């Protein structure tokens, strides 16, 4: 997530000529290279805003595309963060049960416009989202820190405020068994500095390989450096089709092997040929590298 704020706003996709069949072919070639231990597992979903939805029907779309589930969002401030409402939570949970789809985590795209680093409303929303996460039987809340919420470690006053906000939120999250996965443009080194200052096991990094590549970071070095402090992944590669751009997802898998990660991978990628064509192809491509189980 970077520019998302309750509505679907992605970078303009760069159309690539190679079709989804090439992705499937590559996945079948790579599959034998990765024999994960039986204890390791991967689920592959998509962010609901990339499915063109902001309601429980996103789970129906995920099922139609052959995914394992979704990352849901709290919703926009203008709409009053709809997921705060018990009836909306219930509707999502009923849709998940009906479709057999999973809900992996809750994103807070609203914090891109109402920043956690200085706006007291954002701090309150984070506390409320922890309660929503617990009520829905989920375990990860993802505050997004882009746009107005972008983090700069050189801006001491903002970072000091953020640390205090996160310490309060983490105290609550830790008691409820919830992880706060902060997503930002910070480097792995700066993420570690921030996590060390907050000093809570409830705070981790929500790692987006596309965002980090955009910033010029080496994701193959950053993933092992962050290690167990990564709680979940976003996969995208600017406007490219997955597997046809800058990021070698086979090498990313090897980096993930080093940290013994099991969990969700959320597709947040461009769809130059349309979401209904490209997302099933992405799933097949990624499944060849990230098997459901070893």
Please provide the spans of the model-predicted regions.
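Hydrophobic alpha-helical membrane-association signature
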Residues: 88, 125, 162-165, 248, ...
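Glycine-rich, proline-tolerant flexible connector loops at the mouths of alpha/beta enzymes
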Residues: 73-91, 146-151
């Amino acid at each position: 997530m970077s520019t998302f704020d309750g509505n679907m706003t992605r970078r303009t996709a760069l159309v690539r000529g190679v079709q989804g069949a090439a992705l499937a072919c590559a996945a079948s070639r790579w599959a034998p290279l990765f024999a994960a231990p039986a204890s390791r597992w991967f689920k592959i979903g998509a962010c609901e805003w990339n499915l063109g939805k902001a309601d429980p029907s996103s789970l129906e779309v995920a099922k139609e595309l052959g995914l394992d589930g979704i990352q849901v969002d709290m919703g926009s401030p203008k709409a009053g963060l709809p997921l705060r409402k018990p009836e909306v939570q219930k509707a999502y949970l009923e849709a998940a049960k009906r479709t057999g789809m999973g809900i992996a985590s809750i994103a807070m795209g609203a914090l891109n416009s109402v920043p956690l680093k200085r706006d007291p409303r954002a701090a309150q929303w984070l506390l409320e989202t922890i309660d929503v996460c617990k009520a829905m039987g989920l375990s990860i809340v993802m505050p997004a820190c882009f746009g107005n919420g972008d983090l700069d470690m050189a801006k001491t006053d903002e970072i000091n405020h953020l640390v205090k906000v996160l310490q309060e939120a983490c105290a609550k999250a830790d008691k409820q068994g919830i992880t706060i996965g902060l997503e930002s443009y910070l480097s792995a080194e700066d993420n570690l500095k921030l996590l060390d200052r907050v000093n809570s096991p409830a705070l981790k990094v929500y790692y987006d390989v596309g965002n980090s590549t955009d910033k010029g970071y080496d994701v193959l070095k950053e993933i092992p450096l962050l290690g167990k402090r990564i709680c979940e992944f976003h996969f995208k590669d600017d406007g490219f089709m997955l597997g046809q751009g800058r990021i070698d997802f086979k090498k990313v898998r090897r980096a993930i092997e080093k940290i013994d990660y099991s969990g969700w991978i959320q597709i947040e990628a461009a769809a130059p040929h349309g979401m209904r064509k490209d997302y099933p192809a992405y799933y097949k491509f990624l499944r060849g590298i990230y098997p459901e189980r070893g």
